[in-house]
Amino acid sequence: MEVGSATKKLQCQRIGCNAMFTDDDNPQGSCQFHASGPFFHDGMKEWSCCKQRSHDFSLFLEIPGCKTGKHTTEKPVLAKSVPKHPVAAPTSSPDANAATKDSCSRCRQGFFCSDHGSQPKEQIKQTLNTPGQAEEEKIEPLAPPVQKAVIDINQPQVCKNKGCGQTFKERDNHETACSHHPGPAVFHDRLRGWKCCDVHVKEFDEFMEIPPCTKGWHSSSPDPAV
């Protein structure tokens, strides 16, 4: 008996989903996705559709989608985000600033003044920590070791290795089961890439399609050390 195309497993191409589905099992609301692409600026990663953000790339990819609909194999067309350049505040010359500070009653009395950036010396001294205080702040109690959760070998899990995201069972896991990126993602000068394989592209969808460079075990923990 020939299996129809309706039962063929397909991968959803919506941003933030990537789930496997079939044409005969694709109800409205089964797909949770991001309606528009990401925005990267000053080390911050943000979804432009819902303004959810994170500094950590792995946590950023785990932010759930803000819209629901049907799965699709059509890749979304992403609008290129234009970074917002901060406008520098006007600065006054040192001579002019000194003149205004002399005429300002708050500055002359030693109070903090946001207009002229002065700060009383006593307040500065209080913010400085002595060497003994700094050492005390560094001493923290040791946290108890994290206990690994006991998982059924037949229980489906989602691999958290970067670049993988596949569903697996522990009974089928082995040393070459997972294709992933061991190194961190790198975002610099509007380029996106992986440090482990030194591949960099400009567009986010091209970045997500960079093939993994390493084989290994699937891991359901976002932290390889756990």
UniProtKB/Swiss-Prot annotation:
One of its GO terms (biological process) is defense response to fungus. Zn(2+) 1 binds at residues 12, 17, 31, 71. Changing residue 170 to K: Disrupts the interaction with SGT1A. No effect on the interaction with barley HSP90. Zn(2+) 4 binds at residues 181, 196-197, 213. Residues 12-71, 159-218 form the CHORD domain. Zn(2+) 3 binds at residues 159, 164, 178, 218. Pfam families: CHORD. GO terms for molecular function: Hsp90 protein binding; zinc ion binding. Zn(2+) 2 binds at residues 34, 49-50, 66. Keywords: Immunity, Innate immunity, Metal-binding, Plant defense, Repeat, Zinc. Signal peptide: none annotated. InterPro entries: CHORD_dom, RAR1. A motif (CCCH) lies at residues 104-124. The 2 cysteine and histidine-rich (CHORD) domains bind each 2 zinc ions, and the plant-specific 20 amino acid cysteine and histidine-containing motif (CCCH motif), located between the two CHORDs, binds 1 zinc ion. Interacts with HSP90-1, HSP90-2, SGT1A and SGT1B. Forms a ternary complex with SGT1A and barley HSP90. Required specifically for plant innate immunity. Is essential for resistance conferred by multiple R genes recognizing different bacterial and oomycete pathogen isolates like avirulent P.syringae or H.parasitica (downy mildew). Contributes additively with SGT1B to RPP5-dependent resistance. Functions as a positive regulator of RPS5 accumulation by assisting its stabilization. May function as co-chaperone of HSP90-2 to positively regulate the steady-state accumulation of RPM1 and protect it from SGT1-mediated degradation. This is Cysteine and histidine-rich domain-containing protein RAR1. It comes from Arabidopsis thaliana. The gene is RAR1.
